[in-house]
Regions:
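Gly/Ser/Thr-rich loop/hinge elements
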Residues: 1-51, 78-83, 99
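C-terminal recognition in membrane/secretory proteostasis and scaffolding
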Residues: 117-138
């Protein structure tokens, strides 16, 4: 998905895997639909935004292509593998951690939006949309 918005070769996420923390860098593949002519964009996030959605939001945020609006994300920056022990017993093991291109750990509290929506003060679910529209019309 990130390849649709980011130039070819842009670092989307850094993965550190294994006991030696081998770094695997994941980059875009160059299908950039907008070819640098991306209109203003807002990405809405909340505590339910996890894993791949955090990776995409973080990549767009760090590249300056989107303003992230909402509340801090879940913080699911880990990769698990399922090891079958028996037919009825499995063990889920964390085998890697994800970091944004700039080295921000997705697991450490999730992503912080550029514009925070105060959920306590929100009068309706439209508060999220109102915040996004305000960013887009400034």
């Amino acid at each position: 998905m990130a390849s649709r918005f980011l130039p070819e070769g842009t670092v989307v996420v850094r993965e550190f895997r294994g006991p030696d923390l081998e770094e695997v860098v994941h980059t875009t593949q160059g299908t950039n639909w907008f070819n640098g002519n991306l209109p203003s964009m807002v990405v809405l996030v909340d505590q339910g935004s996890a894993s791949a959605s955090e990776i995409l939001a973080g990549a767009l945020q760090e590249q300056g292509l989107a303003t992230v609006v909402g509340t801090p994300t879940f913080g699911k920056g880990s990769v698990q593998e399922l090891i079958n022990i028996t037919d009825t017993l499995s063990l889920k093991v964390t085998v890697a951690r994800w970091y944004t291109a700039n080295g921000v750990s997705i697991s450490d509290g999730g992503l912080t939006p550029d514009v925070l929506v105060d959920v306590e003060a929100a009068t309706s679910s439209d508060s999220w949309i109102d915040a996004a529209v305000k960013v887009l019309t400034q």
